[in-house]
Amino acid sequence: MCTDYEGPKPEQKAEIERKLRQEITGFVPRARIRPTDCAPIVVPEEDAYVCREMRWGWQVPWDKAPLVNAKSETLTTLPTFKPHLDQRCLILSRSFKEGGAQFHQPDWTVFCLAGLWRDEPSGSRFVMLTTTPNESVAPFHARMPFVLRTEQYADWLRGDFFKILTTPDKSPLEKFQPQPELF
């Protein structure tokens, strides 16, 4: 269960726009993001992509804690998610944590995680899709966020997402190794 990730830095806006192949409006960078925090989320709006500030976690009647993750394998069958399958979003990320380890792309480039969003009385909220882990994450946790390949972004937001659900990006990620303090 992913409950901690790092959003892009302000200077990475151009990188995000290059990967999305268009300008985005409304980008507000966030550093460390945890459940109930607000985060920049990319959604389609008319002929463009916009960044909207959304809170992480859906309120659900059976639990006081918000629902923050959704298993990609059961997404299309569970009544919690089925009504929102057309409300797909991109979660902007530089890294995520699983099992106490932090994972990132080479050179700390921005990548997108698959998500769903919905409007609630308290405002717009999102959940993060998860999948089986790749070889980098498997020693640390049984699940990981659903990482999208750059060429999947447009289809995830507006196209054939069923095929994407069966082909998560299993490319290896790098594990962040903090340097020990010398003094």
Task: Set out the residue ranges of the language-model regions.
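Short linear sequence motif anchored by a di-proline
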Residues: M1-F183
